Structures are given as structure tokens and as C-alpha cells.
């Protein structure tokens, strides 16, 4: 397929036109079980009526505004999440990589407030944290990092599911 989209993933030779519940349909009408959409991206399925209605309602009011302003639905959701999770604050992000970047920054900021100017973040082998510079550094796989140096410092890796590896760190 001739495309102007960067080749950042090994794409399969199929083009989807629409989805219904757990099913995707290609441009030839062939149906596929969607088991690869992304983690919690479409966890209620494609075109779920309640999700579609909520998106339509919000789109009719306001699509987007800067976080420099208060957004009523955002405040309502934050309140509900904090109530459920017994937390004081939430951080909304668009992707797992952005959430992990925020976690890295918050951990480093906390360390700085505690007087640690060179904090170390431990992650595990076999993990995946995203495709930003910090998150590929957090990912132990060298293959993910090749060609993107210099990478941020302060990450070490333990062997997943190996308590002795963690103790040695």
C-alpha cells in the first residue's frame, strides 16, 4: 500500500473500515475479532452506544480546550476517580507513554524534594513503557533504544519475577 504515514510499525496488509463491538471489518467486508486494538483503548468495544452517545454529547458542546481552564466533565471525572481510589489528585493523559512520562517526572520531582539529585528508577526486563525517549530508556530492551541516544540517565533493570535480582539492585 502506498502511504504517506511513517513506517514506525510493521503494518499488516489489511485496512479496516469500521468496527462493531469486538469485531472489525476490512474494506472488503471481512470480519476480524479485535484482540489487538490496544490496552484499554476500546475496552467496551467499537461503537458501543453509551460511549458513542457520550462522545456525541460532548462534541456538540466542546471538543477541546486547554488545561489552562477548568473543564466541568474533567472535574467531575476527577472527583469520581479520587473518591473511588481514595486519592487526592488525578492526572489525565492521552497515552500510556504520556502517563509513564508523568510517573517518571513525578518520581524524580519527589526525589528532588527529598534531597536526592540523582534518583534511580528501577524497571523490569520484558517490560514496555512507551516510545518516548524516557520510556524507551525505562524499557530494558536494547532493540528499542538503538539509534536514539543519548538517552536519559537514571534507569536500571531487574529481572522480572526474580526476587534475587531485585535485591541485588
Where are these regions (language model features)?
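Short secondary-structure boundary/capping elements
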Residues: 16, 47, 73, 158-161
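Active-site-adjacent loop/helix segments that line or gate small-molecule/cofactor pockets in enzymes
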Residues: 1-20, 68
